[in-house]
A protein has these predicted regions:
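A short alpha-helix-loop-beta-strand transition element characteristic
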Residues: 15-17, 66-71, 187-189
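General beta-strand structural signal in soluble alpha/beta enzymes
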Residues: 18-20, 50, 118, 191-192
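A structural motif corresponding to the C-terminal end of an alpha-helix
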Residues: 9-17, 181-184
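Short beta-strand to alpha-helix junction loop
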Residues: 1-7, 19, 163-173
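A conserved short coil-to-beta-strand element within the FAD-binding core of flavoproteins
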Residues: 14-34
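C-terminal catalytic lobe of FAD-dependent flavoproteins
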Residues: 139, 144-216
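Flavin-dependent oxidoreductases
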Residues: 27-137
Length: 216
């Protein structure tokens, strides 16, 4: 993703600036502008849009927002159909969603390049940018597991969560879920794909903020 950002900025041939590997320390607001103070310098802008992703809550607090909710990361693993099996999916295939769960469920997505993605599952990740199954951050884990909203989410979805973890480490169980929609799929039809991490905004009661958290 970072490489694509660099390529896009260079292709625009504009006055854009791209600064990587900098930590935001705080924000200063004046009548004329907003200053972003990082560990490498200060940047000033008339208008500022912060797209924080998995760090959105931490950046909001650094900007003085009294945010009770907390971002907790959930990793989603994907499989891909092999080239020989792509003919089995002609369009998007989704399961009927369960409104009791904050996740959509495993589905099939035809990509623009012809690839067919199958997934994702949804498992708690021990690192906010934990795209690997064994990625770990002490800070992120402590931050999530000392928040009561995390435990309330866990306990209210215990069986769902256990099944998701089992599927994360078992290709056979993942395939079994896919076969509910396409029974003819076999182990040879799927191969490991990418993974992503969802920034789930959790309230203290374990409820998820599915859309926007707006503060005036």
């Amino acid at each position: 993703a970072t490489k694509k950002m660099v390529e896009l900025a260079l292709s625009m041939n504009s006055n854009s600036e791209l600064h990587l590997q900098e930590e935001v320390i705080r924000f200063n607001h004046t009548a004329e502008s907003t200053e972003v103070i990082t560990n490498h310098g200060t940047y000033s802008a008339t208008h500022l849009i912060v797209c924080g992703g998995l760090q959105a809550d931490r950046l909001a607090r650094k900007d003085g927002v009294q945010l009770k909710e907390k971002v907790v990361g959930f990793r989603g693993d994907y499989y891909e159909l092999t080239h020989e099996a792509r003919h089995k999916v002609k369009h998007l295939i989704y399961p009927t969603p369960n409104p009791d769960f904050p996740f959509l469920g495993v589905h099939f997505t035809r990509m623009t390049d012809g690839e067919i993605e199958c997934g994702p599952n949804a498992v708690f990740t021990f690192k906010r940018e934990g795209y690997g199954k064994t990625d770990f951050s002490l800070r992120d884990t402590w931050d999530a597991l000392t928040y009561k909203g995390t435990w309330k989410l866990f306990f209210s979805n215990m069986s769902f969560g256990i099944n998701e973890y089992r599927r994360a480490f078992s290709k056979k169980l993942f395939l079994k879920t896919l076969q509910r929609m396409i029974p003819s799929l076999t182990m040879d039809d799927i191969k490991p794909g990418r993974s992503g991490v969802r920034a789930l905004l959790l309230a203290e009661d374990g409820d998820t903020r599915d859309d926007f958290r707006i503060e005036y």
